[in-house]
């Protein structure tokens, strides 16, 4: 048997490169989570999941590691502190958490609590998010930045919050918005604290590049900024402008794009200062990316820079432009939500079954009587028996041609169902035999490099792709997926992952691999009576809130976990996933009404002797249990 180590597994899943030293594999072959990159302590994911199941918490389970979240906040702030010290930057840096990344109360609560030491702020983009921001700022003095479109009610709420004493900045996204703010300021007699969003010509890269540039959805053009300054001056509100904001997109993959935006944005700041606008803050927005695939490249699922390089470039570029222009260096704000939240959340679920040929007839005995088979099938038998490394190309090409021929002959009525089934069986056996030979050949013949895709098996996972990792479906985002056990054993299956929705789009066919993107995920054959779990990593940003209820699969169970030196871990919070009745409620159905309707019908059927009392009672009991139960699959 070929020797296999946990280092081999770490390599094929590229774990060291995307894991940010927060994930590792222990001697048991299980994935572990660390509270910080330098910590020797860890939590065994498989052991944790087993313990949760004993507590009747069923998969799929969303695990939120709050120490990891704190560590990411600390890492970003530490990088900026170092950059400020190294560059002798005379002003400050401040992190703002964009609530849209993950609005869950416990998440925002943890960020607000831990972020106190860094004077962390909250960025909001809607009225509901504004209410959340005010809630957390009450009694805590947390600063708030308001982005996005705003109506009269929104603006008036911000104005009165400002008067009461909240530190709240309202960012002007469009000229018509500024006119509303000025009118309401006059009406209420309350002076706002204003920011102006600048529409830069610089653009980001990757999936969100259109967030920047001349055609961006938000921001004022340069001519509009001049008009805004004039309008504010006329209304004696120019001194209310304390901030400028720009944003060229989420997940910026190239550091040079960030530098270009910083240079252009800081020039705007410098020119506005020269025009007499007392700006104190430059909000550089989001864009600090996450290396999802570990390639450290400019590919859309990666970034070609580190947090430290990002922070250093921000500080250096802004200082350099300000000194050149002869203006004061501003306080710097960033809204790095993705980089803050992505790593702390892991979805773990069980694999249910596979589309393998385990239950197919075994035609092994038939091989001895091949002369009685149809010619096409007989040729496949001959290839299977004689194949070796010297005839690989020819045998592979012949196999492809013969299986196509078998399908055509079956459609024309010249092959029986059993003969076509045997042809399929032989096709799989031949490909696996070829694969066994190919793995030992270097270099692999070019035409055989992609044939392994034919061997890919579909593993069905107990989750909804649309609910738990919607970006995988919507924008083809890569997320690392790794089995959380048996990593001291060599995987023996090349797989895709399908969810349990009734939708063909509910399948993942692109994965993070050793050399970047790959079309299959190495997994193990599932043993009889074995619980086999996979983890979906780096899903803490956007996925929960973007998830939808396709097939009415609801929120998963969620567990907040912190590290504990004595016991290994501590469960802080358990949030139950949606029961069936809760999912139905989202679409205006009421569980009690459904039960009553069915019960009334059952009583009529009992009276007409269509069903027995026992059958009716048992059916209603099953229906009631289903309404109260988890939307995902059990045994």
Curated annotation (Swiss-Prot):
Residue positions, PTM N6-(pyridoxal phosphate)lysine: 100
Required co-factors: Mg(2+); pyridoxal 5'-phosphate
GO BP terms: arginine catabolic process; putrescine biosynthetic process from arginine; spermidine biosynthetic process
Keyword Metal-binding: yes
GO molecular function, one term: metal ion binding
Pathway: Amine and polyamine biosynthesis; agmatine biosynthesis; agmatine from L-arginine: step 1/1
EC number: 4.1.1.19
Residues involved in substrate binding: 282-292
EC top class named in words: lyase
Record keywords: Decarboxylase, Lyase, Magnesium, Metal-binding, Polyamine biosynthesis, Pyridoxal phosphate, Spermidine biosynthesis
Keyword Magnesium belongs to the record: yes
InterPro entries: Ala_racemase/Decarboxylase_C (IPR009006), Arg_decarb_HB (IPR040634), Arg_decarbox_C (IPR041128), Arg_decrbxlase (IPR002985), De-COase2_CS (IPR022657), De-COase2_N (IPR022644), De-COase2_pyr-phos_BS (IPR022653), Orn/DAP/Arg_de-COase (IPR000183)
Catalytic reaction list: L-arginine + H(+) = agmatine + CO2
PANTHER family: ARGININE DECARBOXYLASE (PTHR43295), BIOSYNTHETIC ARGININE DECARBOXYLASE (PTHR43295:SF9)
Entry function: Catalyzes the biosynthesis of agmatine from arginine.
Family: Belongs to the Orn/Lys/Arg decarboxylase class-II family. SpeA subfamily.
NCBIfam families linked: PRK05354.1, speA
Protein name per the record: Biosynthetic arginine decarboxylase
Species whose genome carries this gene: Geobacter metallireducens (strain ATCC 53774 / DSM 7210 / GS-15)
The encoding gene: speA
